[in-house]
Each structure stands twice: as structure tokens, then as C-alpha cells.
């Protein structure tokens, strides 16, 4: 023992243990000072942790009671039992959280915990909240109405559907902005008496149809629910049970999955309006077409169609800002019916359209005089042919036949 007195003294100075304890640990480790000190420190830390725990399993307490009734060991060598692994019952994390992974249910339970510590529970019930749930390519958006308390009827059914959807992982979500489609999606030409002449209207950039997400809206009413603008469907109808059960489980119903026509999947919005009665939207009334029409082209028409053309001009709308609702009072042209005739259509600068009959021998000056008389203006102008537009450069004394303007369309362009 005298040979190990220095090791015992060193162990006591390091650990603060008694001489008997120091001797026991050193002998247990073949007088290896480092290993003995490490074992002593580890056991002391575990012992302190056990003392700090408020609850210990009953089987461990029973062992301690049994140890009290056992005969003590000889005082010459104290016995230090191996520490029992501490077993403390802990409350399982809500939502099945495993290995530090937070699931959708964990977020949902966190919401409930926050509400338990808040003073405004009644205010929370009066707010309209929006939730979403679902997978990578599809999901549900749940927009709940203010709760009015369960009083039976459809309110209980709808509340059960929404509460169940939230329990299956619904979390708060912002409302999506629905992009409105462009009203024009083609290529065209703007025709008319404009300073730019004919103008090409380019086609806007096309949107990739595969990048769009198909959206379906399910609205819950007092009497039942509707899908988009479809008819009212009753809650107690057995045909609707599968759809409601899928929503309660937090998944997109199979019936709605058929609407997913793009790779980006389906977005289903649930709106809780069970406090409101469903009102069927008014059906649009059918209105028969009552406007006028015009045959395009330069085909020859007889003089008997002049009255019909004038009536059509009264009902025809144009794109210019100076549209007129009726044809001006035109001056008559002396037409020799025994001579060849032609019909010339004239589009005035103010948007009005004229259609009159000339002889082949009438000159361009006759046409100019007719336009001035019809428009009531002597402002100088140029005459352009139809499409493609180009100015008429012939002398005013040239006949319509020689100028190649038989059955032509002329456009007035002010200078």
C-alpha cells in the first residue's frame, strides 16, 4: 500500500474523494490514475443528473428500497454500484415528430399551442382563415368562414370537413392572384383612313400551357356545395360521400384529379360559406343577332342594292373615333342608264361610307365633287385605293374606266 500512497494522494487531490474511494477506484483500474479518475468523474456526473430529475420510474425506486434492507458491505471496502440508466417518462411530441423532422401536423399543432396562450380566442373564431394541404403536384386551399358555433345542420358537416382537413396538415396560405387571359391573342391588320395606313398588329408572346396550374373552386353553402359554377350538390347524397371523405383526409378528391390537364397539377380552393344560402345564378338571355352585314370584295352589284347598302351603313359600327350613325345626305349623280354603269364604294375621313353608281364615262373630278357635296366640306384631300392602299395619281379629267376604278373602293385621306 505504501508503494501506491502517492497515487492515492494524487487521486484525492484531483477528485476530492476519500482515501477509501480513491483506493477502490485505483485498484479497480490496476492503479491507472487516468482511467480511474475518468470513471469516477463520469459516475459522479450521472449521479448528479439522477438527483436533478423530478420523476424516476417505479422499478428504480423499488431497487433503492430493496437496497435499504440489505446488509451493508464491510466498511473496509465501500461498494459503488453501477449507475442505473435514467428513465424519465416524457410527453411524446405532437404530430408524430421523429428525429427532428417537422411535419405539416407539427406546424398545425404549433398553431393550436399559440392559441392556447393567447387571450383572443373569441377573436380568432371570428376571422376568416385560409389553409392549404396536399402533395407536390396537387393541393387543397381551405378558406374557412367565421365560426358561429355548432348548432346542428349543415354547419356541423362543413365544420367537420374543414377541421379534419386542417388536422391532416393544413397551414396558413396567402390568396393566389388569378391571372386574367389577354383579350387578344392573334395576328391581324388594322385597316382604315389613318396616317400610318395599314398597320400590322403583332401577336403577343404565347404562354406555355404546361406552365399553367388548373384551379378548381369548391364552395360550401347551407344547402350543399358547388364545384366551380356547377349545380348545387347535397351533403346527404351518397354520390358525394367519396369526395367529402377525401377532403376530410386532406387529399385531392379523385373526381377533381381528372381536371389536372397540365404537368403542374391541380389547385383546389375550398371556401366555407355555410352561413349563406345558395342562390342559383341567373341564366343569360339569348339575344338573336339583329345587326347588318357587308359582303367583302369587289364583286359587281346592281343598282337595286343601293338602298340595302345605305340601310346597313346606318347600323354598322366602325373603329374610328368619328363614327356616324347614318349616311350623309348625298347629292344625286346624273347617271345615263343606257350607258355602262359601275358601283364605287367610298370611305370618308369621318368614318362614313358611301356607295353610289357612276357611268364609266364619269371622271375623277365628278367623284371629288360628289365627296365634297356629301361631306359638306371643301377641305383638300387625297384619294387612295383599297387594299393595299396607294394614292390615285391620275389627272382629274381621267374617266373611271381609264383610271381602272370600276367597282373600286376609294378612301378619303385629308391633307
Curated annotation (Swiss-Prot):
UniProt domain SEP: residue ranges: 213-279
Indicate where this protein resides in the cell.
Nucleus; Golgi apparatus, Golgi stack; Cytoplasm, Cytoskeleton, Microtubule organizing center, Centrosome
Q: Where is the composition biased (Basic and acidic residues)?
A: 109-118, 174-183
SUPFAM superfamilies referenced in this protein's UniProt entry, alphabetically: NSFL1 (p97 ATPase) cofactor p47, SEP domain, UBA-like, Ubiquitin-like
Pfam families hit by this protein = SEP, UBA_4, UBX
Question: Which keywords accompany this UniProt record?
Answer: Cytoplasm, Cytoskeleton, Golgi apparatus, Lipid-binding, Nucleus
> UBX domain: from which residue to which, for each copy?
337-413
Regions of biased composition (Acidic residues) lie at 55-68
Where it mainly occurs, coarsely classed, is: nucleus
InterPro entries in the cross-refs: C6orf106_UBA-like, NSFL1C_SEP_dom_sf, SEP_domain, UBA-like_sf, Ubiquitin-like_domsf, UBX_dom
Disordered: annotated segments = 1-21, 39-210, 290-338
The source's domain of life comes to: Eukaryota
Q: Which PANTHER family match?
A: NSFL1 COFACTOR P47 (PTHR23333:SF20), UBX DOMAIN CONTAINING PROTEIN (PTHR23333)
* Role of this protein: Reduces the ATPase activity of VCP. Necessary for the fragmentation of Golgi stacks during mitosis and for VCP-mediated reassembly of Golgi stacks after mitosis. May play a role in VCP-mediated formation of transitional endoplasmic reticulum (tER). Reduces the ATPase activity of VCP. Necessary for the fragmentation of Golgi stacks during mitosis and for VCP-mediated reassembly of Golgi stacks after mitosis. May play a role in VCP-mediated formation of transitional endoplasmic reticulum (tER). Regulates the centrosomal levels of kinase aurK/Aurora during mitotic progression by promoting aurK removal from centrosomes in prophase. Also, regulates spindle orientation during mitosis.
The protein's name: NSFL1 cofactor p47 homolog
* Gene symbol of the encoding locus: nsfl1c
